[in-house]
A protein has these predicted regions:
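Basic amphipathic alpha-helical segments that dock to polyanions
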Residues: 83-93
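Pre-recognition alpha-helix immediately N-terminal to the DNA-recognition helix
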Residues: 49-54
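Short coil turns linking two alpha-helices in DNA-binding domains
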Residues: 79-80
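Short capping segments at the starts of secondary-structure elements
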Residues: 58-63
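A short acidic, leucine-rich amphipathic alpha-helix
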Residues: 66-72, 83
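Non-DNA-binding regulatory cores of transcription-related proteins
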Residues: 92-169
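N-terminal leader segment of winged-helix/HTH proteins
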Residues: 1-41
Length: 169
């Protein structure tokens, strides 16, 4: 499953194209993460940077155990608690999102701003795209507030078929 880097794709199609500059996305994400962590006064350790890089390298929602397999460790692969703590940090800092329905993580396309995570997940090609919609985000906040609920976190996952897969049907 792939996740699109929204700033590099046409707004009308948030899913990645074959000609998409994947290496550029990884470089941009790591550079932006380093700058954000420095401004926020938190450390982007080598392990945190490497886990973030693994998440972005695949452009796919990636599970914690897949990350563990790809992390070289001094005595084999990294331990599950280490990877989960690292992913918790990256989520707290808004550098990655957890897609609950897939039990996987993706790089955040807009880590500089607090926002609600909205994902389109194609059941055909298994690609996923993070989208940003202020109207939908505002609606979520209004519904929560009307119920007297203090919304802290929201992830919306919409499953269907992307334009490419609908065209093949």
């Amino acid at each position: 499953m792939k996740t699109a880097h929204a700033s590099r794709l046409p707004a009308s199609d948030p899913f990645p194209l074959a000609s998409h500059d994947h290496a550029g996305c990884v470089r941009d994400a790591l550079s932006q993460a380093a700058a954000l962590c420095e401004r926020r006064g938190v450390r982007l350790t080598e392990l945190r940077r490497r886990v973030l890089e693994i998440v972005w390298e695949s452009h796919s929602p990636v599970g914690a155990y897949e990350i563990m397999e790809r992390l070289p460790g001094e005595r084999g692969r990294a331990a599950p608690p280490t990877v989960y703590r690292t992913l918790d940090f990256l989520c707290r800092e808004g550098l990655v999102h957890r897609i609950d329905s897939l039990n996987a993580f993706v790089g955040c396309t807009a880590p500089e701003a607090l926002h609600r995570a909205l994902f389109l997940i194609c059941r055909g090609c298994r690609n996923a795209a993070e989208i940003h919609d202020g109207t939908l985000e505002g609606s979520l906040e209004r519904v929560a507030a009307a119920a007297g609920f203090g919304l802290e976190r929201a992830t919306v996952e919409l499953t269907g078929l992307c334009a490419h897969c609908r065209g093949r049907a």
